[in-house]
Structure formats: C-alpha cells, structure tokens
Curated annotation (Swiss-Prot):
<dbReference type="GO" id="GO:0006412">
    <property type="term" value="P:translation"/>
</dbReference>
<comment type="subunit">
    <text>Part of the 50S ribosomal subunit. Contacts protein L32.</text>
</comment>
<dbReference type="GO" id="GO:0003735">
    <property type="term" value="F:structural constituent of ribosome"/>
</dbReference>
<dbReference type="GO" id="GO:0022625">
    <property type="term" value="C:cytosolic large ribosomal subunit"/>
</dbReference>
<keyword id="KW-0689">Ribosomal protein</keyword>
<comment type="similarity">
    <text>Belongs to the bacterial ribosomal protein bL17 family.</text>
</comment>
<dbReference type="InterPro" id="IPR000456">
    <property type="entry name" value="Ribosomal_bL17"/>
</dbReference>
<protein>
    <recommendedName>
        <fullName>Large ribosomal subunit protein bL17</fullName>
    </recommendedName>
</protein>
<dbReference type="InterPro" id="IPR047859">
    <property type="entry name" value="Ribosomal_bL17_CS"/>
</dbReference>
<dbReference type="Pfam" id="PF01196">
    <property type="entry name" value="Ribosomal_L17"/>
</dbReference>
<dbReference type="InterPro" id="IPR036373">
    <property type="entry name" value="Ribosomal_bL17_sf"/>
</dbReference>
<keyword id="KW-0687">Ribonucleoprotein</keyword>
Length: 118
C-alpha cells in the first residue's frame, strides 16, 4: 500500500533525488525560471519555497541551512540578498508552474517553473 508516501521517487535513489533537487533549485535561483518535466517541477516547488522562507529571516543559521541545499555560493548570496527581501511581505507562493506541452523525444509532460517576482 502507498499510504503516507508523500514524495515522488522520480526513478532515483534518495541520494540521487536530493542531488537532482539541489541542482534544479540552484538553477532556478540563478536563472529565475527553468523548464523541466512536470513531475520534477512539482517536486521542486516545496523544496525551493522552503529555502526562500528561510532566506526571508536572513540569519546565519538560515544561511548555513540553505548552504546545504544550494550548490553555488553565488546562488546562496542571491537567495539572501535579492530573493529574501523581495519576498519579505509575501506569505508563501513564491513560484508558479506553467505546463508547456509534451517533449518531442519521449512525450514527457514538460513544465516551466518560475519565481514570481512582481
């Protein structure tokens, strides 16, 4: 039975899945929007939103926690210097997912996940 199994496996081990989410989160923070499969985008959304919520506090502890999940120092700096203050008054919902159709090669459903900065 599948009861209480919240996350998608994405056909990866837990270590591979965490590495994938860290890479996607780093790219999203750096670029502001990325295109990936719909399942990965839906799994990435709560991961990134928790990082942004931590960045809103701006504490040293929050910066160290975010450093565990963001691979590049530049992305972590952008998270705390730009995104945290930009979302300071917004109570969650920092990202949006837009479906973009099917991938030509294998028919996978693609989606664009982007930060809502306005």
């Amino acid at each position: 039975m599948r009861h209480r199994k919240a996350n998608r496996q994405l056909r990866r081990t837990s270590e591979q899945r965490l590495a994938l989410l860290r890479n996607l989160a780093t790219s999203l923070i750096e670029q502001g929007a990325i295109e990936t499969t719909e399942a990965k985008a839906k799994e990435l959304r709560p991961f990134v939103e928790k990082l942004i919520t931590k960045a809103r506090t701006g504490t040293l502890h929050a910066r160290r926690l975010a450093g565990k999940h963001v691979h590049k120092r530049e992305a972590a700096d952008k998270l705390f210097q730009e995104l945290g203050p930009a979302f300071a008054t917004r109570p969650g919902g920092y990202t949006r997912i837009l479906k973009t159709g099917h991938r030509k090669g294998d028919g996978a459903e693609m989606a664009r996940i982007e930060l809502i900065l306005s």
